[in-house]
Amino acid sequence: MKTLLTMELSKKSLEEAKKFLNKYQEAYSKGIDNAVKYATEMMYNKVLEYCYANGISNHTSQIQWQYDDNAKSGRVWTNDMVIIFNEMGTGIVGSNNPHPNPDGPFKSWKYDVNEHGEKGWKYPKEDGTYGWTKGLPSRHMFYSAFQDIKNEIGNIVDIEIRKTVGDLYW
């Protein structure tokens, strides 16, 4: 028995295919944008969780997140030095427990700037008294949150594309 497969092409069928592909491309692009925005917000929430877990929740109001619709990019950041010191670590304790990714903007980070070493130093506390420390280990809340999102990004993208593309998604 002979099997025959035929396919008919016409101007109309090609125009319909083009419409379908354009619709798919727009929906796919929107899904990717939604995934970036959602992942940015998730990372922000994970940073907050790590801050609470490390006992620095009173500084979380200084952590921000933003999604730029024009650039289609998101970011999570802070200018709060307490959070930055906790992220990177300080003193002899920090140099013995450094940040797992000392590259980028913190490549030149110095743990024991004033060379206090084992003797440590006094610092003013919020209640007006002074505390003593040898420094802080790196608690890397931002780095850990980024690693978490990096591990989840495939699922995030898949879900967001399915939401926008729907039945068109393979």
Model-derived regions, located:
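Short, Lys/Arg-rich flexible segments
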Residues: 1-83, 100-103, 107, 111-170
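Extended Gly/Ser/Thr-rich low-complexity repeat segments
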Residues: 84-100
